[in-house]
Each structure stands twice: as structure tokens, then as C-alpha cells.
Amino acid sequence: MVLSPADKTNVKTAWGKVGGHAGDYGAEALERMFLSFPTTKTYFPHFDLSHGSAQVKGHGKKVADALSNAVAHVDDMPNALSALSDLHAHKLRVDPVNFKLLSHCLLVTLAAHHPADFTPAVHASLDKFLASVSTVLTSKYR
């Protein structure tokens, strides 16, 4: 999916407003995913999945850091996310549908924390961006 210049601006602006809360938002999105889509818990059998768990917070920070990297390299996401794509495809073997589920939960989390900034245009741009990230992460599954 091709991001327009306006999409890239919207994504960078929206992610910039996340600021120092990125790890918290990542953890919140994971918690939403685990509650809304319980089958996703199967990839984390060794985690304490309770609210506020240090393991969920730690993984939420990893998710947020990966997204920050994708935002910073929006014009070259395949190279920026190559190692992460390898990890998910070959070692973790995460079902690709889970990226869509997490993307949805991230959108809900961002909308809940930044309702005034979450315009239809920003929503569409973030959705396209997260779909692009998902495509890159699943590109090595073939």
C-alpha cells in the first residue's frame, strides 16, 4: 500500500504526539488485543498477561519502538523492519492475521488518547501505515 505525502505527514504528526507514552500505548494495545481476541494469548504462554504486567509493558515497548522505527524510515520500511520480519516469520511463526488485530487495537488506543487529533484523514493514514507495516512483517512468510 502506497502512502501519499499527506499520509506520511499525518502519520509522523500523530506518532509525534504519542511522545513518551509510546510504550504505554503499545502495552495498552496489547492488553486490548488479548481481551478482545483471546486466541492471540497463545503466542505468549510464558507471559503474565494480567493488567499492568511488566512482561506486557516490556513487549508493548518493543512494539512501540518498532513502530517508531517504521515511522522514521517510512520510505524504506522493508529494510528498516527486515530483522523483525525474519523473527516473526521464521522463529516466532506468528499468524499474519494477528498483525491486523493488533493494528486495530493500536488505532483504538490512539483514538482513545487523542480524540481531537484522530480525524478521519489521520485515521485513514494511520490505518494505511499499519497495513503497510503488517505487509512488510509478513513479506518473508512465503
Curated annotation (Swiss-Prot):
Q: Which InterPro entries would you find in this protein's record?
A: Globin (IPR000971), Globin-like_sf (IPR009050), Globin/Proto (IPR012292), Hemoglobin_a-typ (IPR002338), Hemoglobin_oxygen_transport (IPR050056), Hemoglobin_pi (IPR002339)
A Gene Ontology biological process noted in the UniProt record is:
hydrogen peroxide catabolic process
Q: Return the PROSITE patterns for the record.
A: GLOBIN
Q: Could you state a single Gene Ontology molecular function term?
A: peroxidase activity
Task: Give residues where Phosphothreonine occurs.
Answer: T9, T109, T135, T138
Please list the residue ranges annotated as the Globin domain.
Answer: 2-142
Cleaved signal peptide residues: none
Tell me, what's a Pfam family for it? Globin
Q: What are the Phosphotyrosine sites (modified residues) in this protein?
A: Y25
- Chain sites annotated for binding O2: H59
Residue positions of the PTM N6-acetyllysine?
Answer: K17
Q: Which residues carry this modification: N6-succinyllysine?
A: K8, K12, K17, K41
Which keywords belong to this entry? Acetylation, Heme, Iron, Metal-binding, Oxygen transport, Phosphoprotein, Transport
Could you say which tissues express the protein in this record? Red blood cells.
| Function as written in the Swiss-Prot or TrEMBL entry | Involved in oxygen transport from the lung to the various peripheral tissues.
| Cross-referenced PANTHER family | HEMOGLOBIN FAMILY MEMBER, HEMOGLOBIN SUBUNIT ALPHA
Family stated for the protein in its record? Belongs to the globin family.
What is the recorded name of this protein? Answer: Hemoglobin subunit alpha
Which organism was this protein described from? Sapajus apella
User: Which gene specifies this protein's sequence?
Assistant: HBA
